[in-house]
Amino acid sequence: MNKATANERKKLRLLLVASRKHLSRGDLRSLIRFLESEDCGFEIKLQFSDPKEQPELLELHRLVAIPALIKLDPQPKQIFAGTSILEQLKNWLPRWEQEDILISSGLGINLRQKESENGRTRNELLLEDENLVLRQENETLSNQIESQERLLRMVAHELRTPLSAAKLALQSQALGQIDLIKLQEVVKRRLEEIESLSKDLLEVGTTRWEALFNPQEANLANIAAEVILELEKFWLSRGIGINTDIPADLPNVFADQSRMKQVLLNLIENALKFSNDGDTVEITMLHRTNQWVQISVSDKGPGIPEEEQQRIFLDRVRLPQTSNETSGFGIGLSVCRRIVEVHGGKIWVVSQPGEGSCFYFTVPVWDKRNKSLEPLTLTQG
């Protein structure tokens, strides 16, 4: 696309419908930078709107998902949504520029009356464009429905942990192992967790669950200690040891504390579940590079065949050799993968059948210079 000079640039009025949390995403920040750059080729007037403050926009523009970028002027209106808004926009900019040149030269009027070189009328071309937009909207809607279904499965999985812990506390109190005050503390904390999950469900109708996370400065050692304490009854009752190797100078990370707790809780709970009585579970954290902290959780359980090591991170995958003995990995590891990826990290497993498994994941280091609590744009080697 030829870059126009400032005087030659035509105006393009766009509306970005997105919440404040959406605007912290790397893809939207890249979109905004592109629209503000010389590479765009148009004189852009970009407006922002938060759907929570102006919910009527969802109905007015018939939006099926947010964030969404809307071309308001020149007509016809066009909507881009999903996680590839910038790529979609770049594909359309040359076409809009060409249309503008044709109309400005007077050829645009003839195009409306005559057939184009390939035999299609202007109206047919416009209809084709509208069909493309509808296909994009349909794809976005399908992705939104899939995201909502994943969130429902995730919440159902997460509800089991606080409910099981509350049930265990009731049993412990009945056996005289804890007093009533301790029971009340446990039940209160678990009810708060369930309430938090309910809030996520209330938001799922208007946004993707990935946008629900609230990254901030977090101390992974403290989060791990909290998880280990919560699972104390499970590992003490079976004589399983938990060893931690966490440096005193481990830097804080940039992460959603509740989501990080989900990941650690799931990985440690799995390690305990697949360990034999008397085994040891190892939890290690290290400052791998200037930008990343690496966490690992290892056990001496049955291990995972190599051909299964990628599949276990997919939705609702259970290992054949453990399905009859345990509840399997279920949805938990797919949830871990999505949470880690939302933070920009990676998750993987190293395992040999009969020799145990070690799960690794990475989290970005907190940058003290970042005062706006926005995610860093990081790359891993």
From Swiss-Prot:
One of its GO terms (cellular component) is plasma membrane. Residues 154-367 form the Histidine kinase domain. GO terms for biological process: circadian rhythm. GO terms for molecular function: ATP binding; histidine phosphotransfer kinase activity; phosphorelay sensor kinase activity. It catalyses: ATP + protein L-histidine = ADP + protein N-phospho-L-histidine. It comes from the Bacteria. It is an enzyme of class 2 (transferase). Pfam families: HATPase_c (PF02518), HisKA (PF00512), KaiB (PF07689). The modification Phosphohistidine is found at residue 157. SMART domains: HATPase_c (SM00387), KaiB (SM01248). The N-terminus interacts with KaiC, while the C-terminal histidine kinase domain autophosphorylates and is probably responsible for self-oligomerization. The N-terminal domain stimulates the C-terminus to autophosphorylate. This is Adaptive-response sensory kinase SasA. It comes from Prochlorococcus marinus (strain SARG / CCMP1375 / SS120).
